[in-house]
Structures are given as C-alpha cells and as structure tokens.
C-alpha cells in the first residue's frame, strides 16, 4: 500500500513541477521586455530562471523515479547538465545576462538542495578499520 502511495505522490510531484516550470517560463518569456528595462530586473530574471531549473530537475528526477524505482537518483551528467542547458537556452531568449545569472543562481540552489537531501536521505555506512598488524615481511620504521 505504501509503495503505491509513494509512487502516486511522485507522479503528482513530477506533473506539478513540470507544469510550474512551463508556466514560469511562459511568464518570463511573455514579460521579457520588462526584464530588459533595468539591471536589477535582469538579475531577477536570472533568479527566476534558476527556479525553472530546479522545477525541471524535480520533474525529470521524479519521472525517472517512477520509471526506474524509488531508489533512483539524479546524476550530474545526464539529468543535471540537460536541465541546466535547457534553462540557460531558455534564459538566453529573454536576456544574455539572465542566462549567466541563472547558471550562478542554479548552482547555488543545487548546492543547497544537495545539502538538504544529504541531511534527510543519506544512509550512514559504518567505516571499517584496517588491521594494524602485518603478517611477516620487512618492518618499516
């Protein structure tokens, strides 16, 4: 019962984050002239595009968890690079500086997401101490 509930919540989370990223991109693209008016608005656009990155990464990661199982994790090369390049291309349609600042804000957001997920979902592996005695052979000083 709990596996199906977890799977349903993962599907719902994937759909909601995908829809929010599309709506946020559409809003940012529709208001691109407003973001080009001042430097502060361009920085705000980069910050909002970092949310597009986080939402699209959540959508992709949750969709992969549905397909490949609950223990599947997003890796750097396929998922994160794909979502980041997609976000940078979308931010470049609004303003070039939006693309640059979205990369910086996205990396900061990814760092904090990694810290939060490590805190809550990491499994502690007990360390194994190496034996201190040697069997035969030369002894080094």
UniProtKB/Swiss-Prot annotation:
Top-level taxonomic group: Eukaryota
Keywords: Membrane, Transmembrane, Transmembrane helix
Keyword Transmembrane tagged: yes
InterPro entries, sorted: KRTCAP2
UniProt topology in membrane: Multi-pass membrane protein
GO biological process, one term: protein N-linked glycosylation
Summary of subunit composition and partner proteins: Component of the oligosaccharyltransferase (OST) complex.
Described function: Subunit of the oligosaccharyl transferase (OST) complex that catalyzes the initial transfer of a defined glycan (Glc(3)Man(9)GlcNAc(2) in eukaryotes) from the lipid carrier dolichol-pyrophosphate to an asparagine residue within an Asn-X-Ser/Thr consensus motif in nascent polypeptide chains, the first step in protein N-glycosylation. N-glycosylation occurs cotranslationally and the complex associates with the Sec61 complex at the channel-forming translocon complex that mediates protein translocation across the endoplasmic reticulum (ER). All subunits are required for a maximal enzyme activity.
Homology family: Belongs to the KRTCAP2 family.
Protein name: Protein KRTCAP2 homolog
